[in-house]
Amino acid sequence: MYAETLKLVARLPERRPAPVLPARLDQLFRHLALPACDAQDLEEEIWQVWMHHPHRRAAIALDRAADDIAAQRFDLAETRLERLVRACPDFPEAWNKRATLYYLLERDEESVRDIHRTLELEPRHFGALCGLAEICASRGERDDALFVFQAALRVNPHLDSARTSMEQLRSGTSH
């Protein structure tokens, strides 16, 4: 899955988001690409849109799973997210949250699988891209990590943490 996900990252610029995602994300990402923008506010708004689901129960389940992750109730979070991705397989943030959970549990293969699905549905998901880059770096795949961080910066040029990680990877002071 790792190699297929890197191939998907290479094709992200030509991919379109899933039709289930709100069209207003397009406008938010256009603004985020501008050098002079309030990137923090735009990022927060994008995350809010990603966390939202038209079915209230799905949004509540995602919020609860996020709370479970924050409280380190990982088994409960995994159960909630398993149910959520089964019930709403086109909900990118459900897949991304489960990828995050698996990353925290050092279950990288499962995390990459869910990142792959996230990026299939939302190719602009800079959070998923940064997560994948971190996994690449932890595997010692420096060039792959740099490639994926660069893809994240193409989507969101204001990701200072990605720039810092790239500098550390280039200088050999990280991962």
Region spans (language model):
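TPR-adjacent "capping" and linker segments in tetratricopeptide-repeat scaffold/adaptor proteins
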Residues: 13-19, 47-60
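Alpha-solenoid helical repeat scaffolds
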Residues: 29, 44-47, 82, 116, ...
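Alpha-helical adaptor scaffolds
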Residues: 55-127
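Register position in tetratricopeptide repeats
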Residues: 70, 104, 138-139, 171-172
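TPR/TPR-like (Sel1-like) alpha-helical repeat modules
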Residues: 32-35, 142-171
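Helix-turn-helix repeat elements of alpha-solenoid scaffolds
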Residues: 34-41, 70-75
